[in-house]
């Protein structure tokens, strides 16, 4: 029992000492805040003021029209894509969705590539991108 009480008393003294040392007195905290304020190089008066401007209906309509023009021009640009000329088919090639294991020749479709699954046991020519 005496050993248990001695350990508890030691623990209590240690906790009291730890809490007393970990919290600074209130006077030091105020001095630190003042020194931080005086040492700070950024001053709020250095920044320009911000003004808030209300939009009228006319400005909103113009921005909507401009946005619609941009959208339509982007759509037209995507529609006007020129089809790339296809390379001539070489005689030894693999058709799309057929097996193309590594000793086999390349895929016939220029937009297709050989994809292998299950540790290269099942390979087939597949078209990856629709925009090609």
Swiss-Prot record:
Positions in coiled-coil regions: none
Positions annotated as glycosylated: 39
Record's subcellular location: Secreted
SMART domains: Agouti
SUPFAM superfamilies, A to Z: Agouti-related protein
GO cellular component labels: extracellular space
Main localization category: secreted
Annotated keywords: Disulfide bond, Glycoprotein, Knottin, Secreted, Signal
Domain of life: Eukaryota
Name under which the protein is recorded: Agouti-signaling protein
Organism listed in the record: Macaca nigrescens
Gene: ASIP
